[in-house]
């Protein structure tokens, strides 16, 4: 894509390749197949654009990603002015609190507590001590390592690893929604991602290993092939359906059978 002066992205080319056999619940489980897929996409894009591609942005998410609260405390012998250096040191200390086999992908700054007052920006305030509160987004260390390995083998430098779900929330949520408080839910890629915002800050994030594929499997329980169930879900599935709505005709299946729309929608709505 090409970034426009107003910040919008102009799509120059788009390539899609199936990945269900080696990416499960947002995690790579076969590095060789992932590398081959990335190489194929790179080659096709270069052929379409007639340009060499050397770097890429890779959205990260998937099962196991969640937030962990952390507090960093600093006490001073006397009341002192909080400087940028003090705040930077607190942030660095927070990033050093890597929790075991997990790593911090992003540290979301919450409030700072200085005595009895709470501030978003403590610089310039005198205090005898300061508490920095952080919400760390963590995931398994292998997630980043596997992504870098696959794309390096495909001849691509990973420029950045934005958290896909948060990038989507930033585009879809308004400022007033984040200020007043809201829950943002995204279902897809065999997972359901949930984020809570309040006072313009992320307050909680979790990725649940249940998603759209579970709906597809429920539909397949009507003796329908998984491929056809996925197609029907995309075409007819609704998050909300009123059972007394008689305007929908039965859904025709490839084998000549038909399914009542009520039965189909009941399966979809039960998951949502």
Feature names for model-found ranges:
Residues 2-183, 201-203, 212, 225-227, ...:
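Nucleotide/phosphate-binding catalytic cleft detector across ATP-hydrolyzing
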């Amino acid at each position: 894509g090409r970034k426009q002066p107003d910040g919008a992205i102009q799509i120059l080319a788009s390539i899609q390749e199936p990945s269900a056999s080696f990416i499960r619940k947002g995690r790579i489980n076969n590095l060789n197949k992932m590398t081959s897929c990335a190489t194929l996409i790179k080659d096709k894009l270069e052929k379409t654009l007639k340009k060499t591609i050397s770097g890429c942005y890779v959205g990260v998410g998937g099962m196991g990603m969640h937030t962990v609260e952390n507090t960093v405390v600093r006490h001073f012998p006397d009341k002192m002015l909080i400087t940028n250096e003090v705040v930077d040191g607190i942030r660095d200390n927070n990033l050093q609190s890597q929790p075991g086999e997990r790593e911090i992908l992003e540290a979301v700054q919450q409030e700072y507590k200085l005595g009895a007052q709470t501030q978003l920006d403590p610089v310039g305030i005198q205090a005898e001590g300061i508490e920095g509160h952080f919400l760390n987004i963590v995931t398994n260390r292998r997630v980043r390592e596997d992504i870098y390995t696959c794309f390096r083998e495909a001849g691509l430098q990973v420029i950045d690893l934005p958290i896909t779900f948060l990038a989507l929330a930033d585009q879809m949520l308004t400022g007033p929604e984040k200020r007043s408080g809201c829950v943002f839910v995204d279902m897809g890629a065999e997972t359901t991602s949930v984020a809570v915002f309040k006072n313009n800050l992320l307050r909680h994030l979790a990725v649940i290993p249940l998603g759209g594929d579970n709906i597809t499997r429920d539909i397949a329980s009507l003796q329908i092939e998984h491929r056809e169930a996925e197609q029907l879900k995309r075409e007819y599935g609704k998050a909300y359906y009123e059972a007394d709505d008689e305007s929908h005709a039965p859904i025709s299946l490839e084998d000549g059978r038909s399914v009542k729309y009520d039965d189909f929608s009941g399966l979809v709505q039960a998951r949502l």
